[in-house]
């Protein structure tokens, strides 16, 4: 009889763990979607020294030491 209770307890624990992991993965997915919607696509203007380009792109084409060269960077 103790084996049946232990088996039921193990099943309940596993089911609860799966639910918690599914909620965390959904939360991560929503954050990733929000980031992708707010990132700057390829060819878009970006601010120097800022990480606003979409994943896999970099803000290039400007001199970070020249204060007059603002707004000329592009996500590439």
Curated annotation (Swiss-Prot):
Any GO CC annotation of this UniProt entry: extracellular region
> Do the record's keywords include tRNA-binding?
no
Q: Where does the entry say this protein is expressed, by tissue?
A: Expressed by the venom gland.
Q: Which UniProt keywords apply?
A: Calcium channel impairing toxin, Disulfide bond, Ion channel impairing toxin, Neurotoxin, Secreted, Signal, Toxin, Voltage-gated calcium channel impairing toxin
Protein name, as recorded: Omega-scoloptoxin(13)-Ssm2a
Subcellular location, principal: secreted
After translation, how is this protein modified? Answer: Contains 4 disulfide bonds.
What family, per the record? Belongs to the scoloptoxin-13 family.
Tell me the compartments it is located in.
Secreted
| GO molecular-function terms, A-Z | calcium channel regulator activity; toxin activity
The signal peptide stretch is 1-22
State its role: Inhibits voltage-gated calcium channel (Cav) currents in DRG neurons (IC(50)=1590 nM).
């Amino acid at each position: 009889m103790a084996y049946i209770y232990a088996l039921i307890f193990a099943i309940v624990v596993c089911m609860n763990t799966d639910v918690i992991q599914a909620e965390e993965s959904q939360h991560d997915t929503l954050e990733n979607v929000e980031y992708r919607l707010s990132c700057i696509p390829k060819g878009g203007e970006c601010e120097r020294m800022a990480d606003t380009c979409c994943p896999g792109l970099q803000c290039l084409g400007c001199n970070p030491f020249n204060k007059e060269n603002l707004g000329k960077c592009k996500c590439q």
